Amino acid sequence: MTPVVTRPDRDRPEEESAVSFEDSDVVRSAVRVEGFRDDEFNYQLIRALGVADYGGSTVGECLAVVAEITDGSPRTWALAFERLAERVEDRGRGCLDAGRRVSARDHLLRASTYYRTAEYYAESVTDGSHRTGERSRACFVEAAALLDPPVELVEIPFEGGSLPGYLVRPAGSDAGPAGGLPTLIGVGGFDSSAEELYFHMGAPGAERGWNVLVFDGPGQPGCMRRNPDMTFRPDYEVPLGAVIDHLSGRPDVDADRLALAGQSFGSYFAARSAAADRRVRALVANPPVVDMSRYMEAWVGKDVFRMTRDIRPEDVIGVPEDLLPHQMQWGIGAICHRFGVPSFHAWRQAIEAYRLGGLTPSITCPVLALVGEREGAEPLDQFRSFVAEVGGPVTSVVFRTEDGASTHCQSDNIRLSAQVTFDWLDEQLG
């Protein structure tokens, strides 16, 4: 659930610009670098901007769409980003029709991001979210075929369904060494997608000589669109075991050099797997989540988390903003859907099971723990607890504000995060 946090008005008057060209006939830029007063909206904007590092967005497109969004309104966010995605997709298809493969690829990659960004706040998690999520995947699949080498679509059999994903391989890997390449499995969080993980892990890993598998697991939108009953589960070592089984049988994968990298909620999933499965030879936790219940209480606030009144998704339909903020209405629907529970209280009880507890000392492979210094007191506390309790060698990195990488999952500096992550992985398994 997303809390509504606004920045207080400044007491001091706003300083005037030292130089203004408003009355000039030459204007260098009419674009203003402006975000939102709502902190979560700002983070989601940074999240969309961040993937520009690997071709997933452009600064101009993201800043232009801000003007179409009402601060704090999930509905206007979803509509504005969907319109942007449609415009960019149309350009990409025009380039494809004209035989301009590189231009088509670039546009379709960005359209995929903008559809995913719209999906995050789509008003209905079973309707609008489904539509934009499918279009995000469709654009990425077409772009993936235009990459060099093409990204491979994978379907991992699991419990009567399948987990969709992508295997991203380095250039020239078709003639790779006997025994295969080191391989990283990227594990996303509550609202991530395999397509987004391509920009965070797939592209930076492939250019460093790694295979990278990114996938959508139980509870994540890309999985639930095709497997509606595959909701989140605390024993994520089970689906991750199926992913490792799939990779271990491939000749282009070195099964003795398998690593996991979990982002956000995904770090809990990855840590569970590393504790249970000795085939995992290295683990990256970004940031470590050892207790999801504590984490969520700190995020939404104690009063909201412990409220005595239970709320079901159907209870909030049409409720005015002044009675229940739109973001909270959206959040209740999203958490109930993804966890497969009927109400807020049922969700609060369910996430009690998402704790590492005594499992952390069982993680004996090398571990890299990452966190941004401005993620907040609770993530930093869980980071320190995890580092202290891990049973194997651990390297810890706190990203600083001055490095431009202090946000959640270093969404503001993916290239720096990738450098730290893959340099460490090369030292362990390269």
List the predicted regions and their residue ranges:
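N-terminal cap/lid segment of alpha/beta-hydrolase-fold proteins
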Residues: 81, 131-176
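Primarily recognizes the serine-hydrolase "nucleophile elbow" in alpha/beta-hydrolase
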Residues: 116, 248-303
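Short beta-strand element of the alpha/beta-hydrolase
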Residues: 178-189
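Alpha/beta-hydrolase active-site loop
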Residues: 230-252
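Short beta-strand/loop motif that positions the catalytic acidic residue
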Residues: 363, 369-371
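Short alpha-helix in the alpha/beta-hydrolase fold that links the catalytic acid
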Residues: 365, 378-388
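Catalytic histidine neighborhood in serine/cysteine hydrolases
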Residues: 387-406
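Catalytic active-site module of serine/aspartate enzymes centered on a nucleophile-bearing elbow/loop
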Residues: 410-430
